[in-house]
Amino acid sequence: MRIIFMGTPDFAVPSLKAIAAMDGDFEVQLVVTGKDKPRRSKRSEPEPTPVKKAARELGIPVMEVDDVKDERFVDTVARYRPDVLVVAAFRILPPAVYEQARLGAFNLHASILPRYRGAAPVNWAIINGERESGVTTFFLRKSVDTGNMILQEKTPVYPEENAGELAARLAEIGAGAVVKTLELIRDGRVEPLLQNDTLATRAPKLSTENTRIDWVQPVDALCDFIRGLAPRPAAWAIFNHKKVKIFKASVADFHQPEAEEQSAIPGRIAVENNRLFVMGLDGWIEILSLQMEGKKVMQSHEFCCGFRCDEECPVFS
């Protein structure tokens, strides 16, 4: 089976390696990935994508693509005469590309479809307090993340797990699902399942606007929001007119009666015994790890040691 693999970030690497380790019935003829990223230093070589690095180690030819609609790219895919296209965390492909695959093109998506269709399924699952996540393989179609499903694998979302940790686990689970999917296609045993669009939910791309913390939330929701965006891009707020990223927090058994009675303002800060607390809608959370604008990531006790505020009632806004 001739395979073209398409992917860019770390999430896609376990799947590529798993396919490369399969028996002789499966051959990855080409890996397609994004362009190298420029480094901060102009003298340094551009940074290859994680998938490109893995493909080089495996000795598989690599093609970097900027525009998936470019006719030269479409022609290249056609010349390889692929039986299957495997896509994991790549771009939205036009039909002219994925229809080249004789037996079909499928995508690995990090959610239990039809829930969390979109660019950031892992993040939004945690933000919304889901207790279960997983992966789905499905055949590509023009409408994004709506194709007929092939295989699903489910896993719990652990209470303290952040988005980066869950994504790493799903990448490994997904690699197994990709292998099983290829075997089903080879053996002609695929039984595609239609998605129920009435159950669909969205997982939109993360932005500056939708990653800012709204402190007028229950404390459980605040902690879910923070871990759902950790370690990247990170939930953020404003303190002393500067941006602060918050990476880790927990619900706190903390009370400050005077503050709660006089200034029950969500976002209010309290420092006690070098611990940093922030008021939510129904209690307090403890901030454990954060980063002030222009500074390195620090633990909360480091922040508390140098705590200064321009306001009488300090708040994260």
Curated annotation (Swiss-Prot):
Molecular function (Gene Ontology), one example: methionyl-tRNA formyltransferase activity
Name recorded for this polypeptide: Methionyl-tRNA formyltransferase
EC number, UniProt record: 2.1.2.9
Keywords linked to the UniProt accession: Protein biosynthesis, Transferase
Gene3D superfamilies: 3.40.50.12230
Cellular component aspect of the GO annotation: cytosol
Organism: Prosthecochloris aestuarii (strain DSM 271 / SK 413)
Family, similarity comment: Belongs to the Fmt family.
Superkingdom per UniProt: Bacteria
HAMAP family named in the record: Formyl_trans (MF_00182)
Top enzyme class: transferase
InterPro entries with a match to the protein in the record: Fmt, Formyl_trans_C, Formyl_transf_N, Formyl_transf_N_sf, Formyl_transferase-like_C_sf, Met-tRNA-FMT_C, Met-tRNA-FMT_N
Sequence positions that bind (6S)-5,6,7,8-tetrahydrofolate: S111, I112, L113, P114
Record's catalysed reaction(s): L-methionyl-tRNA(fMet) + (6R)-10-formyltetrahydrofolate = N-formyl-L-methionyl-tRNA(fMet) + (6S)-5,6,7,8-tetrahydrofolate + H(+)
